[in-house]
Amino acid sequence: VTLAAPIQLAATVNEHLAQISNTLIYSAMAVYTLAFFAYIAEWLFGSRSKVARTAAALTAPKTQETAAAAQGPAVTVKSAGGTAVLERPKVVVRSAAGSRDVPDGPGAHGGDQQGDLYGRIAISLTTLAFVVEAAGVVARAASVERAPWGNMYEFNITFSTVAVGVYLALLALKKNVRWLGLFLTATVLLDLGLAVTVLYTASDQLVPALHSYWLYIHVSTAILCGAVFYVGAVGTLLYLFKDSYENKLATGGTPGRFASSVLERLPASATLDKFCYRVNAAVFPLWTFTIIAGAIWAESAWGRYWGWDPKETWAFITWVAYACYLHARSTAGWKGRKAAYIALIAFACWLFNYYGVNIFVGGKHSYAGV
């Protein structure tokens, strides 16, 4: 049997398993909602103390503080009646790319113990929601005895499961990504809400063109790439906000209280930038393989490797955009915000290739099911 051979599908749909899958997906959404509010509580309690509000300055290396003290700050002389007042200027320390990361999670920045407790509860709830959602995906697959990504609804629920799995895997590897939890659960809830309200399709068998083992190879890698690109895009957005916040502080500006309480909880902008680059660079070769696998499948299904079908075209545009980002990130004058904008454009191309092409553009890849 070759990889291009058709796969054997179940003749009927197990409606009982399909209903169990729906129940599990809704249950996962409920647990994600609880996790989201737990993350909010962590950020609120973790940012209320004076120590927490000045946490950004505390993340700078002590060597910088020692050097600044040795040099001695400049002073401003003010006249207060007949007395000369020496005023120490405000010093804003900005973490450099080589400085250490901030402690993991908002509660680690000096917030109270209750904030840390909420953070641990949030992680536990996220893990529980991930397990429940994964069970829902498996039940969906079992109901039709095939891979659970034959339409947009199935792709969405599998995509969000993998995205949360990537986040939890990074936590398990002791990576400093706990700050992603709040934003991840919020967007996963949006993704699942869209899936169950707009994209929902009842369990059914695949269209004939998808009866191939390449379905397991090509689409699974596309889902994994999208999930990792998504994590990188969330980090890139946070990097842009954090960089603006640091720039405002460096120029003597005073950010709003809400911005300060939220953005100072994040790692330094240089750390966020490095994280996003590593994430996107790590998955880019797999995206290259995804496109190649799709071309091989296209030759088997339609007798040609490439035909500039809208889905193929936008997959290639996405590849070019991420290649430009990786090149810009290593080019002097294009690092930082300029490269970040390219990364967001690249992810926007990926999103359009999925939502825009599937829903609004016709072609040989019209398997949305909506």
Please provide the spans of the model-predicted regions.
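Polytopic transmembrane helical bundles with strong interfacial aromatic enrichment
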Residues: V1-G303, G307-V370
